[in-house]
């Protein structure tokens, strides 16, 4: 099952994002309903979610710095143990896109290459570069949906 912006598959759990990504473990939201994800995001997710993305190789520190939170802030948040609601929201957005890309392309490696390759459809930007804004993330999700459905891009 796939999860896209504004749409959660019938089971309505974060667990359904992607079996391979284990998004629930990465973002600290195991088995949460959509409402639970909203509440957890508002309270601030554990910093361990960012650490897992780094450890898994899905994002580099430079990418986290650019699209989730600055390095200096990450260092500060490690001491506190939790992200702010805004940082948590960015983390959820990134995890959702990573999971959708891995689901669409069938592997972490293929998804990683696609996310980092500039494309004309995104006016020469790489999909990963678009994730620093909500609208950019929506555009990437729309593109993934078109690819997944075999529509020309």
Q: What is the predicted function of each stretch?
A:
Residues 1-153:
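Non-transmembrane "mature" sequence context
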